[in-house]
């Protein structure tokens, strides 16, 4: 079931989403956001180190690309779409550019909220999301767990972002791994 919100999508005016990592999962989320009309392609910036991948994302999706982490300074939402072993390096370059109002979404498997808070700052709005591969068609099912800094208005933004990918269930972090094992392996069968 889609999480219902007290606001319409039109009430949410996001200016910019910045992705760190433009691999397959990041691209799947990006495609869902564009397809779901959450944002226009030019409102998405992808920080990606590989020149060929940047060129591909620009041509395929019409998004902006960069290697400059300072792009996060003007983002409403930052999505960490990198492998778990890359999180420490990404958070190190990202931290100086985040405001307390920026919502940080991590899809890095196994990286706890406490770890992200330690690396980005305990005052940051952070959530973990584990999407499955069906997000590419808008039929995904994602688990999300949030830290205490995420307020009701933030949750509306988050829910509108995640609903573009399919259905979302908010769970406690201790249930996160169980959800991941159940819902993320199912689509391959």
Where are these regions (language model features)?
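Rossmann-like NAD(P)(H) cofactor-binding subdomain of soluble oxidoreductases
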Residues: 60-61, 69-144
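A general structural signal for well-ordered alpha-helical segments in protein cores
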Residues: 26, 54, 75, 87, ...
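NAD(P)+-binding Rossmann beta1-loop-alpha1 motif at the extreme N-terminus of oxidoreductases
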Residues: 7-60, 64-67, 139-140
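Internal alpha-helical scaffold of NAD(P)-dependent oxidoreductase catalytic cores
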Residues: 115-125, 141-179
């Amino acid at each position: 079931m889609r999480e219902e919100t007290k606001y319409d999508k039109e009430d949410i005016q996001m200016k910019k989403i910045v992705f760190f990592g433009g691999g397959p999962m990041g691209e799947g989320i990006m495609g869902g956001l564009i397809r779901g009309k959450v944002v226009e392609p030019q409102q998405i910036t992808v920080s990606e180190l590989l020149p060929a991948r940047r060129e591909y994302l620009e041509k395929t999706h019409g998004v902006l690309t960069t290697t400059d982490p300072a792009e996060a300074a003007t983002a409403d939402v930052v999505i960490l779409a990198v492998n778990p072993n890359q999180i420490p390096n990404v958070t190190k370059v990202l931290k100086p550019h985040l405001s307390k109002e920026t919502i940080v979404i991590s899809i890095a498997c196994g990286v706890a909220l406490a770890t992200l808070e330690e690396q980005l700052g305990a005052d940051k709005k952070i959530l973990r999301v584990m999407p499955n591969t069906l997000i590419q068609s808008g039929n995904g099912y994602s688990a999300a767990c949030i830290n205490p800094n995420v307020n009701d208005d933030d949750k509306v933004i988050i829910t509108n972002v995640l609903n573009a990918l399919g259905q979302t269930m908010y769970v406690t972090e201790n249930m996160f791994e169980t959800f991941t094992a159940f819902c993320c392996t199912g689509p391959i069968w």
